[in-house]
């Protein structure tokens, strides 16, 4: 049974203007996440350090030699939420900048779930 993968508004805003070839590469890895769920490992997914969320992970996408990362987490419903993405190539502070944003997006998502409202969108 495939896992549900939803997207945050922030992820959608980042993803929508990307060129089609990059979107295709990202969607390939998202489909692997749908198939394997939390068991997806390197080279396509990895755990993160420096986060207060034990289940915050990254999808790893290589596109034309550039390293793209999508931060995601599984919520209590065991559905993945793609939080935020970007090209980390040459940016040593990428994780320091993006992890706090991803944590805030996920916390907001959890609050929404507690209220009984769903805000995830399936790619």
Segment roles from a protein language model:
Residues 1-67, 76-80, 87-123:
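Basic, Lys/Arg-enriched alpha-helical interface segments
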């Amino acid at each position: 049974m495939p896992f549900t993968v939803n997207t945050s508004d922030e992820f959608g805003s980042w993803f929508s203007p990307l060129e089609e070839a990059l979107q295709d590469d990202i969607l390939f890895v998202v489909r692997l996440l749908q198939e394997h769920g939390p068991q997806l490992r390197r080279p396509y997914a990895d755990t993160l350090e420096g986060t207060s969320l034990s289940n915050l992970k990254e999808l790893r996408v290589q596109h034309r030699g550039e390293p793209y990362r999508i931060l995601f987490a599984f919520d209590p419903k065991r559905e993945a939420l793609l939080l935020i993405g970007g090209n980390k190539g040459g940016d040593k502070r990428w994780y320091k900048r993006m992890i706090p944003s991803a944590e805030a997006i996920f916390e907001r998502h959890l609050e929404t779930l507690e209220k009984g409202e769903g805000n995830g969108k399936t790619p």
